[in-house]
Amino acid sequence: MSSPERALLNLLTDIALSFDGAILGLTLAVSAVGSALKYASTNAALKKIKDAPEVSISDLRSLLPASEDKSETNDNRKSNDQRIVVVRGVVKPKISGDEGYKNNNVLISPETGDKALIIQRTQTYVYSGWKRLFQSTGHRFMLERSLRKHGADFTRTVPFVIVGKDQQSNSSFVAVNMDGSRQPLPLTTVYNRLQPINSSFLQAFLYPDYPVGLLDIEKILPPGKDITAVGIYSFNNGVPEIKSCQDLPYFLSEMTKDKMIEDLMEQTNFIFLGSVILGIVSVGILSYAAVRTWNKWKQWNHQRELPQRPNDSVVDDEPEDADEIPDGELCVICVSRRRVPAFIPCGHVVCCRRCASTVERELNPKCPVCLQSIRGSMRVYYS
């Protein structure tokens, strides 16, 4: 780890532990609240998927009223009968117009020539340089490797439908509406190639980071793939349609409904446990910081009120040379003045008046010999 990184780490540590750890406690509390909100949303999604009926493609029309099936709905009109359903089937291109258009309603991968309904291509630059030789063991290097470098990302899609797996004809289907879908797609990687980029010696010498390759990845959704769709089912101009629900983490997936429920239950338990741990730790740290702040405030208030009290003068009225005082009568704290007052209630005479006054000003005054809590002191006179 380099010196600037070490200095930055020390600065962040000092900030987190400042105010008796209150900053760290507040940070953990905010993280706990975020985890609790994440748990609530994940648990709500789990409940929706559990309650969603899993039906076959041919039985979908029975879920909505017949009037909705026959009516021509406007794009701006939202049906009150929309509901979340789970269907499983095979994806096929949507046939529009004559039958001869079927073969042209698919995409062709430019690299492999495979037919596809969705093509997603990602191009990412791979960097190298002499700077990475000195950061190969640091946390900064690990963070940089996890970040995405500049590149290109584009997706092409064609209209497609889901039909029953054992269905002989395409009379029963549900159209897939991809508008507004942000969930991950069940794509298959068909092309993965690292294309080297020639760099000059001057570029490698002057620039700490320079591109050495272009990683080109192509993923497709091939026709005939078995998938599960979970989303909002409705009719669009009399055509059954399913679109994504923004509250759910899945839309098109290779997992079955039972696998989705199992996966969400694991996520829910993990998020719940994490939020509980973060909450307990944050409450403990904030409680510790609050107690420390309260004690400091009491001590400050106690010291502020001391000058207002009618105290005896702490100036020695019996100045003596320390060499003339026997060892058994010297103050155990300063070892330069005679022991005068006795602490109450233990009765020990071990301090001079000045040191005894200092001990009494403490937040929790104790006798320096027996460590018993004291209420004050009184002068002892010897006859």
Curated annotation (Swiss-Prot):
One of its GO terms (cellular component) is chloroplast outer membrane. Its EC number is 2.3.2.27. The chain crosses the membrane at residues 15-35, 270-290. It is a multi-pass membrane protein. One of its GO terms (molecular function) is ubiquitin-protein transferase activity. A zinc finger (RING-type) spans 331-370. Possesses E3 ubiquitin-protein ligase activity. This is E3 ubiquitin-protein ligase SPL2. It comes from Arabidopsis thaliana. The gene is SPL2.
